[in-house]
Amino acid sequence: MKKILALVLALVLSLSLAAAEDLKVIRVGATAAPHAEILESEAVTAKLAELGYKLDVVVYDGYVLENPAVSDGTDMANYFQHQPYLDSYNATVDEKDQLVGAFSVHYEPFGIYSDSLKSLEELKDGAYIGVPNDPSNETRALLLLAAVGLISVPEGANAESVLTKYDITDEMNPRGFKFEEVAAELLPSTLPDYDIAVINGNYAIDAGLKPAVDALALEASDSAFAVLYANVVAVRAEDVDSEWLAALKTALTTEEARQYMNDTYAGGVVPTF
């Protein structure tokens, strides 16, 4: 009996391995959190397996190499960026190397955080505020500060504007806040240096912050930023209508994938589907 059971188990295992080997591979570049985590979640991988595919997720430490790796065919797709970032990449390369944002998956809201304050009502005049030092993210930070009533911004400024602290006049900043421009990825670790800081969703998650719990304020999920800065899966134009991309889209936009994002990231990752 034991020999028969062992043979049955061996047969089941061999069939399972054979089935796994039959799955077609989709190689996707991603940053660690939350992108690679989402791709490697049971919600996504199980659905892909049903559709006949499995993922080879290549984790990158930074953004610089991810788009070129898709352009040159090293990776089949990537998942780490919003459309404005992709547009800026496409503007720097030959047409043959340009990529397409095939579909959006999620949005990472900016939040206002503090190491010392429990609410924005505690913020004193003249306080120090850390903001990202790159144009698109500093714009988002200043617009969020305006949305919660701490400052005002030039008339007509919106999600597609480019703003820096130098655009905020004394009249727009009657409480005399002092803005410190810092590399976005450093803001979580330097949070104790400021009274408040405006931090990207992915960097907040990396630092162990829970946006829905720890943020003093968050960008509205129905804001223009939620559309403009939704994170997309990027591919070569020739792959837009491929079967493997359709399978990847299906797997990333199921109700199970939505539930995983909502349960795991506490408001730091908002599904856009």
Name each model-derived stretch.
Residues 22-33, 53-59, 128-129:
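Short, well-ordered beta-strand elements
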Residues 57-68, 159-189:
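Short helix-initiation/N-cap motifs at beta->coil->alpha
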Residues 61-63, 73-74, 78-88, 183-184, ...:
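Beta->alpha turn/N-cap motifs
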Residues 88-102, 115-117, 193, 198, ...:
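Ligand-binding "clamshell"
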Residues 102-151, 258:
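A conserved helix-loop-strand patch within extracytoplasmic ligand-binding domains
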Residues 108-120, 228-242:
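A bilobed periplasmic-binding-protein/Venus flytrap-type ligand-binding module shared by bacterial periplasmic
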Residues 137-146, 251-273:
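Periplasmic-binding protein-like
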